[in-house]
Amino acid sequence: MDIQLYMLAPVRPLSDGEANALLARLPDALRERLAGQKGGKRDASLCAYEMLRRAMQDHFGWEALPEVAFGAHGKPYFPSCSDACFSLSHSRGAVLLAVHDHSIGVDIERLRPMSERMRTRFHASDEAAFWQDWVQRESCCKRRGISAVALRGGEVPAVPDERIFAFSPLHNYVAGVCTASDEKTGKLVRLTVEELI
């Protein structure tokens, strides 16, 4: 199976009715976890999991998401289906999802100013270089299910056969993907909130 990437942008505020409709489509434990969130973070999370539900329906024929569990550092996964792997990320108005049959990690960041101190710490020549490096590191942490605290030390230890790349899915955004698979990446599927609701 090729690596499938989905993106939602912009994430607009959801009405209470829209949020409740998306919450109702989630497995019980995930619904409870997200019900306590408010505002933009809640809206991005609800859209991300609805995008995941649609992707799983497209690729595996699932009508509903199975229970979602979370690793020690927050990596979501399906405990009942190890061959359906995914990674979610959201940043300031955009959501990115990767679906694959092997472990995968994604990260998306909106380009924004970064202090000279941080750029120096990570040996980045400018903000764009900093964020490109950041999303690649973060996607590795997400694939491996380790804490992003590993990023503070600079280098993320290399893993044999791991493939990492960055791309710009949207103006002023950069995304990173990390996988140990040799499969190619399919075309980025762009969605809107209206298409999800």
How should these model regions be labeled?
Residues 1-197:
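Core catalytic alpha/beta fold that binds nucleotide/phospho-ligands
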